[in-house]
Every structure is written in C-alpha cells, then in structure tokens.
Amino acid sequence: MVQKPHSFRRKTRKKLRKHPRRRGLPPLTRFLQEFEVGQKVHIVIEPSYHKGMPDPRFHGRTGTVVGKRGDAYIVEVPDGNKVKTLFIHPVHLRPQK
C-alpha cells in the first residue's frame, strides 16, 4: 500500500493557486507593510513567497498582531477553544478594514 503524503502543502491544490496573470512575486509594498500591536489582520497566504508562511489551515483566518520578531509579526489566531500564536511574514498578512 502507498501512504499518502503528510507534507506541509498537502490538500492545497486550489487554495494556494495563483491566477496566471498574477504569477511571480507581489509588489514591494506588500513586503514592507507595517502593522501596529493590537491591529486585526487577515491571513492570506502568498504562495510564491515561502518564508514566514503559516500553515495552510490558517488561510483566510483573522488574528490580532501581538508583536514583532525580526521581519515577521507575531499573530494570535483563535482556533476552537485555544488561541494559537503564529509567526507570519507581512507578505502573508492584509490589514482588516
């Protein structure tokens, strides 16, 4: 029997797909975004940039910025009855309006 893969990007065939016209890296402003502590952010994974990428199960979730570590932001995301702490690069974050 063959075992199914337990890799980081499994079951993400459609979730991490980019439109052909949007291929390549995003604009520099997405890399240089700044967020305040306490600000709400949406986690939207950028599949072309792998550093600081959160687990795909957090794609589309909303969290709160708690701090900064290096280039990444520390984001707390509610997951059921727990609060998960994630270290996410700003290219994978969008501010909540």
UniProtKB/Swiss-Prot annotation:
The lineage of its organism: Archaea, Methanobacteriati, Methanobacteriota, Thermococci, Thermococcales. Residues 1-25 are annotated as: Disordered. GO terms for molecular function: structural constituent of ribosome. Transmembrane segments: none annotated. It comes from the Archaea. InterPro entries: Ribosomal_eL21 (IPR001147), Ribosomal_eL21_arc (IPR022856), Ribosomal_eL21_CS (IPR018259), Ribosomal_eL21_sf (IPR036948), Translation_prot_SH3-like_sf (IPR008991). GO terms for biological process: translation. The gene is rpl21e. Keywords: Ribonucleoprotein, Ribosomal protein. This is Large ribosomal subunit protein eL21. It comes from Pyrococcus horikoshii (strain ATCC 700860 / DSM 12428 / JCM 9974 / NBRC 100139 / OT-3). One of its GO terms (cellular component) is ribonucleoprotein complex. Residues 1-24 have a biased composition (Basic residues). Belongs to the eukaryotic ribosomal protein eL21 family. Pfam families: Ribosomal_L21e.
